[in-house]
């Protein structure tokens, strides 16, 4: 009968799991287990400790029901190195890998040996693996990546395989890639039910919660895990082992009180950096609010899909994958749909749970309403924003709170040019928010009537995915009098708004819920020319009635703009009035409004 070595990498922090694994080892139905090699990473691992597994190993060695224990302390620093160290100590003909925190059924070894014994391939694995997340309390199946794929915890291989295959010692996860020659080696696939049940928890070497989170937002056809109507109890039929796992899981599930007064959770949002100078309005709002709260002595954390992490202006910016949704929070703010979903499905614990909506996308509103009783406050940016949600859902937003975005007053009060160009205008919003009509239907008439007119366009096409639309826009942006500057930092935008006479934003875009850029133009003295649609009714400037996109109406609009360009008296009058607009509110005052809301019972 083929002698087998079990190989496990472990750590003092996971000694409770290792104890349960020893019970799984004793329950194996394969009779010729020669040894159990255990590599202890306690002193060199990712969570270094002052204690190691020595005492537990002595218990194992005194347990006559366990195979011979080969114990060594790791000397390398990463998972690939530890696995290579383990392979250097094995003496069995077949090595069966077992992770310390996974459950292995009694036929794990016998099934692997049976599949490997004819040596049609030197390595076996399981591409379609079960795993259970203890906090989501959900049972999943990996859909699989192919016949030559497996994670290490499912692998078994002949000892001669390691004569020509090693792990990459420089990586902290995905060490299997090099060991399997980029998953090109022929691999026998083991049966899922006979191999492993992997557990996802908060002390995994690799955090699988990111996999679950990402899977929630992927389209059905590309999801790589499947939620199963299955329970751990169905898979583990040994009462003692099952109860041992439940004891550990209940400890790990216990909520810990957050160290932060305010947590802003952004989820798997499009990636950005808190150091960027050319952010959109929603991202700006996070930075300015968090910074103002920190100035008031609040301990603030922002969890997001960020480029830069660390403490910036008193705020801690943290990878969203490190957010522990099962903990207890004081103030927890879920930002847009990215922060709201999927965690709203679960039992979030917070004294106050707020959803900072920002967007006006109808599809998520039904989902939001489904969980409305969990939410303390819906944070909306305008009366239009609130009314729009109520109209779409047919429900009153009784706990909706209108707090608009603030304005960077000091920045936009700084004039960096001496005079304005009378015939210069700017557009400073996403290019899908009305720019096409301006460029195709209105601008050609304006420029024909007044060849000195200029339109300077800012924002860029990074968020536009329709290549045909991009191509069409590029052509429109190349017409006389139009200059496309793309994405630019605040200093350039401020300079533009002090050079331009008007901010031309004639739009009926329903997704505009506040319009920070218009309020910034008021501060800079750049007179907004806006429609009377949606939120624009609530913003100050020259309002033009929203008219259908026809040649006659576009000509009417163009003529009104021409009149404004030539009437310097009305320009100065408007500029003096608009600089005192009640919509110009500093971020400091807006942050205080939020704080007052936090402090209400």
From Swiss-Prot:
Q: Which domain of life is it from?
A: Viruses
**Entry's Gene Ontology molecular function annotations:** glycosyltransferase activity
Please give the start and end residues of each transmembrane region.
none
Q: Which family does it belong to?
A: Belongs to the glycosyltransferase 2 family.
The record's listing under CDD domains reads: Glyco_tranf_GTA_type
In short, the EC number is: 2.4.-.-
**The UniProt record lists the keyword Membrane:** no
Name the cystine pairs. none
Q: What class of enzyme is it?
A: transferase
Q: Which organism is the protein's source?
A: Acanthamoeba polyphaga mimivirus
Q: Protein name, please?
A: Uncharacterized glycosyltransferase L193
Please provide the record's keywords in A-Z order: Glycosyltransferase, Transferase
Q: Show which residues constitute the signal peptide.
A: none
